UniProtKB/Swiss-Prot annotation:
One of its GO terms (cellular component) is nucleoid. Keywords: Cytoplasm, DNA-binding, Repeat, Transcription, Transcription regulation. This is Transcriptional regulator MraZ. It comes from the Bacteria. Signal peptide: none annotated. Belongs to the MraZ family. The lineage of its organism: Bacteria, Pseudomonadati, Pseudomonadota, Gammaproteobacteria, Pasteurellales. It comes from Histophilus somni (strain 129Pt) (Haemophilus somnus). Forms oligomers. GO terms for biological process: negative regulation of DNA-templated transcription initiation. It is found in: Cytoplasm, Nucleoid. GO terms for molecular function: DNA-binding transcription factor activity; transcription cis-regulatory region binding.
Amino acid sequence: MFRGASAVNLDSKGRIAIPTRYRPEILEINQGQMVCTVDIRQSCLLLYPLNQWEIIEQKLSKLSNFNPEERSLQRVMLGYATECELDSAGRILISAPLRQHAKLEKSIMLVGQLNKFEIWSESEWQAQIEKDMTLGASGQFAMSEALSMLSL
């Protein structure tokens, strides 16, 4: 399970270091294999351990190629999906198209989301968090049925 936000740096070759606390799980369960793709709604990337990505792939494969929205989701998520592997220093390489999509520069935020990470440029992350906090504080947060049942 991945949780918390970590500030990491993108090196000149397009690599980021996965925080040490997550490496054993990724190595033990997935032999260091991960998949990175785009988030279709926000300018961040989604980084999955291989076993979690395979669950997403199964769900995507069940969508209809004849439904334009479903086909679009398949095209983008699968089209950008890039396999990556932790190297001996615990780094992964993020491809140039993925870096461009998420506007990644040197300062990156790696944000745990239980079964995956979100990868944000630091400036985009700060803007998104500010937006999320403002929305929550304003009381204009649209409650889905699942959210209305959630007790924290």
